[in-house]
């Protein structure tokens, strides 16, 4: 960390401050927000989006789609208006597309560009530039796109799309919704049928939303349980009015906070409960968490409910590795819940966490240990021996946990802090803005 970066860092000590009460609403779902902008930009006509997550990642997507010809504006009521260019209508961007910290923007937009006759350069921040893009480069190269990447298949990279691209049948070697989505999006402007075979189901927002925008998309389940997803290319997408449900990954922090802090009784409104995303809530219920669904409803093809969460004594469990793809981003906050549970929680099958915004396995072990938790790191997970419901000791004066520019680690340790005796010092709260700009103010209002 350079001294210049140190001057910019925003440390904060998060401390206990009473129970969480009342009703809160978390910002819109990040996955759905990204895809609303991208698909709206490929439709012909005006797509209107209410409840868009206005975090830095989604704004990176909006800036990139503008650079490729879409008109995207936000009105005073907070509604976003996207005037699309049509599938096949993307224009060559005049400058490099800056992806900031957003792996989702990068991988999905690479898919879009791959089947258009344009060349685009993708750049990102220090954290994103360490993340592997090879898993997307491989299938898109097979479709005919050409790549000049930094060593290890990383950013900055330049992609020259091919139109017409070659339709492929691609079996995912690793469970990744981003790789699946990149290939399906490339398939939109590719003649014929593009097929993705997914051995383990991952989040399915792309499939739901592509269908919602009018793409011809089918999903079949093979004898071995794999999902076979086909999209017919040269599609015409129709503009949509989209109401973005609350992000379950953001709701997760408040759900765990209310479970851990004595006396809490909190309603988190309008939470998206897509089954490929909401496994954390099932795991917390298995641990004994009181999480009740109120007013379950369907919004734009996505299941939504209000969650009433009450303080509960949790019990450690062995987490079934089969749920990993449905809660891959929620393990950092699950580790915090486990640290205050009664008994031992064992997690396995988490190799994917080592290549997220940071190595989330080792970063969470180090951070939780500083906060006084008992944690053992394994090759593919953590083993956590909980306090039995007592608050964590917290970090010593002058000691702060290292967030590695990772928003989920910063927010997870903030929640550990409000469930600790002396608080937890977080070295830098700036990364939180990538996914949840109002996190800190919402935390204050829930404890008011």
Question: Residue ranges of each PLM-predicted region?
Answer:
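Structural preference for solvent-exposed beta-strand-turn elements
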Residues: 1-448
């Amino acid at each position: 960390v350079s001294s210049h970066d140190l001057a910019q860092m925003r440390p904060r000590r998060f401390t206990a401050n009473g129970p969480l009460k009342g009703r809160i609403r978390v910002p819109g779902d990040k996955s759905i927000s990204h895809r609303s902008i991208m698909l709206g930009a490929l439709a012909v006509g005006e797509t209107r989006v209410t409840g868009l997550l206005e975090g830095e990642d989604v704004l990176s997507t909006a800036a990139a789609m503008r650079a490729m010809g879409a008109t995207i504006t936000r009105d005073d009521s907070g509604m976003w208006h996207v005037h699309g260019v049509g599938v096949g209508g993307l224009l060559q961007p005049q400058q490099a597309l800056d992806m900031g910290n957003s792996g989702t923007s990068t991988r999905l937009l690479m898919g879009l560009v791959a089947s258009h006759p344009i060349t685009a350069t993708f750049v990102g921040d220090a954290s994103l530039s360490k993340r592997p893009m090879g898993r997307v480069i491989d299938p898109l190269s097979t479709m005919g796109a050409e790549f000049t990447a930094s060593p290890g298949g990383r950013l900055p990279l330049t992609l020259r799309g091919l139109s017409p691209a070659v339709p492929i049948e691609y079996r995912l070697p690793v469970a990744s919704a981003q790789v699946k989505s990149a290939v399906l999006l490339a398939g939109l402007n590719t003649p014929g049928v593009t097929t993705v075979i997914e051995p383990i189901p991952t989040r399915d927002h792309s499939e739901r939303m592509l269908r919602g925008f009018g793409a011809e998309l089918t999903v079949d389940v093979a004898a071995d349980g794999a999902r076979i997803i086909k999209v017919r290319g040269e599609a015409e997408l129709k503009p949509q009015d989209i109401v973005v449900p609350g992000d379950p990954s953001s709701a997760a922090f408040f759900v765990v906070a209310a479970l851990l802090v004595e006396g809490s009784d909190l309603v988190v409104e309008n939470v998206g409960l897509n089954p490929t995303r909401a496994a954390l809530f099932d795991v917390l219920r298995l641990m004994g968490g009181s999480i009740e669904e109120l007013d379950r409803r369907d919004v734009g093809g996505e299941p939504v409910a209000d969650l009433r969460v009450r303080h509960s004594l949790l019990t450690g469990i062995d987490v079934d590795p089969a749920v990993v793809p449905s809660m891959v981003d929620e393990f950092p906050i699950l580790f915090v819940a486990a640290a205050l549970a009664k008994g031992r929680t064992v997690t396995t099958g988490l190799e994917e966490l080592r290549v997220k915004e940071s190595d989330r396995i080792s970063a969470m072990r180090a951070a939780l240990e500083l906060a006084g938790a008992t944690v053992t790191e394994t090759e593919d997970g953590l083993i956590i021996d909980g306090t039995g419901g007592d608050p964590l000791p917290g970090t010593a004066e002058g000691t702060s946990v290292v967030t590695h520019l990772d928003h989920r680690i910063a927010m997870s340790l903030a929640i550990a802090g409000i469930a600790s005796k002396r608080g937890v010092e977080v070295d830098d709260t700036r990364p939180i803005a990538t996914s949840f700009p109002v996190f800190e103010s919402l935390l204050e209002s829930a404890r008011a």
